[in-house]
Regions:
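Short Pro-Cys-Gly-centered "Cys-loop" motif that presents a nucleophilic cysteine in a tight turn
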Residues: 1-24, 37-179
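Short Gly/Ser/Thr- and Asp/Glu-enriched loop/turn motifs at secondary-structure junctions
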Residues: 27-31
Length: 179
């Protein structure tokens, strides 16, 4: 728990320092998922600062020597509203997918920031797309309904869009964002 708290504190500081907005996150025992808005193309610098700073802190705190992270971070652009929604849901469902607990029971993801409205994550965009907190809860629950035998199936962009439209009573996500 302490390591996760230190990592989140560092993440918030580094994101602020590099003008990167956090959209969603989930800290897992062996990996981290981040969804960010990087308007100034600072993601690489932010990640370098975050990972090296956290590694130094971790090594000092624990007496560990050497690398803390196994590999360089991977990133990909998000080019549609549908994919954005799919990623937010995928990130928050990681603990359930790993058999740890339900998304709403896991304290090391941004799920609670969407529901409670506090924290380091910029929730405005996603909440506007899904109809606020109640829409977010319904949209998140739809991911649980897709589990079959404990295994998640990944949504295609069109499936994510169809799910969003169904959960939003026929409104398009892009229409909600424009409200």
């Amino acid at each position: 728990g302490e390591d996760y708290a230190v990592f989140l504190e560092s993440l918030g500081s580094c994101a602020d320092e590099h003008s990167v907005s956090l959209i969603a996150y989930c800290l897992m025992p062996n990996h981290v998922h981040l969804l960010v808005r990087d308007g100034d193309d600072e993601l690489g610098e932010m990640m370098r600062s975050l990972l090296s700073g956290y590694a130094q802190s971790y090594n000092k705190r624990t007496g560990h020597v050497g690398h803390v992270f196994q590999q360089r971070f991977k990133s990909c652009p998000v080019e549609s509203d549908e994919y954005l929604l799919q990623l937010v849901r995928y990130i928050h469902e990681n603990p359930a997918k790993a058999g740890i607990c339900k998304a709403e029971e896991y304290w090391w993801s941004s799920y609670h920031e969407y529901v409670a409205g506090s924290g380091r994550v910029d929730t405005k965009l996603v909440l506007s797309m899904v109809g606020g907190v109640s829409g977010f809860k319904r949209f998140s629950k739809a991911a649980v309904d897709r589990r079959v035998g404990g295994v998640f199936s990944r949504l295609s962009d069109s499936e994510a869009h169809e799910t969003a439209v169904r959960e939003l009573d026929g409104l398009l996500p892009s229409e909600l964002k424009a409200l």
